Amino acid sequence: MKKTLLIITALLFITSTVFPQSKININDLVEIDGKMYKPLSDKLYSGIVYDSYENTGTKKLDGFYRNGLKHVKWTWWNEDGGIDSTGSFKKGLKNGQWKYYYSNGNLKGKGQYRVGNDSSPGITDIPRHGRHGKWTFWHENGQKLDELTFKDGKASGLSTSWYENGIKEWEYYFIEDGTRDSVKLTTRWYDSGQKWYEGYVKTLNDTTIVWNGLNTKWYENGLKMMQGIYKDGNLDGLNTEWYENGQKKFEGTYTNGLKNGHGTMTYADSAKYVGEWKEGSKNGQGTYTWANGSSLEATWFEGVPDGNAKWIQADDDYYVGEIKGSKTDGGGWNFVLDGQGTQTWTDGDEYVGEFKDGSKHGQGTMTYANGNKYVGEWKEGSKNGQGTQTWTDGDEYVGEFKDDQRNGQGTFTWADGNKYVGEWKDDQRNGQGTVTWAGEWTGQKYTGEWKDGSRYGLGTLTYRSGAKYAGEWKDGNRHGQGIMTYTGGRTDSGVWADDKFLESRSVSSVEAYLDDLIK
């Protein structure tokens, strides 16, 4: 009898230990230092736990504790009654196979844990710590999302990702410490299946993944987008870029992610820059060529041309000299001729001198294709101020200009030696002036008023014979009241018309003028 009682007692002990009958709502347990205790007790809890949703009363979780720690199989449900996750624990740590589900019932993730502690959420918020072996993850629509292998919680080896449509998106590798493999290629595809990226990566600060080494990118149409060298996530070294139509966009060097050194940039409008770059901007010597064939060879600073330059226009007119550049509101640039320079036109004209804000301004010499020349002052692109104009036939003007015309005081000397000294207006003799003749007409002289290049008004003409006419003029002829004094002393005093004497008459209208001449 005693032996029978001992056997029964032993069986009861084993049953209570291996198959504990305790079952309690998990919310009634007390947590102390990460372990669960029975309510109002200092004993660690061992037994079944459960929980339900307050609103619906449906099951929320089912689990088991041993000595206050989660143990063996646990299952969680969502509020709609579907399984959320299920797996096993060992001494409070995830251990063995685990499955996670979306609310629609499709698998979210599946894999093995070894001493996982529920920390470090990873892909799809599934705890990362302690993953070990192959893990697979799915999109909510059931298509595979990711597949990779872990070792002691760290990714290791090949990792493959897919789009929701089932097309592969990524393929890359990890080394045993969980960082990305910098020796093996990382590849990405568009959701159409066309390759997008291919290159090498590097892990910075244990978590940041950056491109490092040779990298190639493609457009979705299959044409190359770029190919270059990265260093710690930034382009650094030779790089080539293309537009989506296959036209080359840029070829040159980068430093720390910015164009630096020599490079060729072809813009969308077919304009092109070939030259030096610094910190992403045109800087140094370079040539910019427009789509129409015009080109600017200049010194650049922070993306703007400035200083000495050579500008060749599409029609082959060109300029060599100083320019002034500026940035535009749209982020572009512009320039004007400014300073000392030489502008040459294809018709043979040439200007050498000063410019300001794009126009001839200051001192300069304009030599025309026909041989005529102007040397003097300019203002806003026109002859203004003192200057000398010479013609190939030997004529010369020295004096004042305004708006490209002779205006003010000036002296015009004809090739035959005749000379006019006096006032000008609108490129014609206008006002007071004196003409002296040379050669066979030496000694002949007119002093008086002029209008539109002709003697007009009061004036005196002294002939080379010594005869003299003093009086009124019109359109270059004696016209009106005047006195003609001949060398023999005879005089014709009266009215003249079209250079002919008509009749004797009082010349009162010119008496004051004649008095001044006598004085």
Q: What label would you give each PLM region?
A:
Residues 16-519:
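Glycine/tyrosine- and acidic-biased, solvent-exposed loop/turn segments at the edges of beta-strands
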Residues 4-14:
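Sec-dependent N-terminal signal peptides
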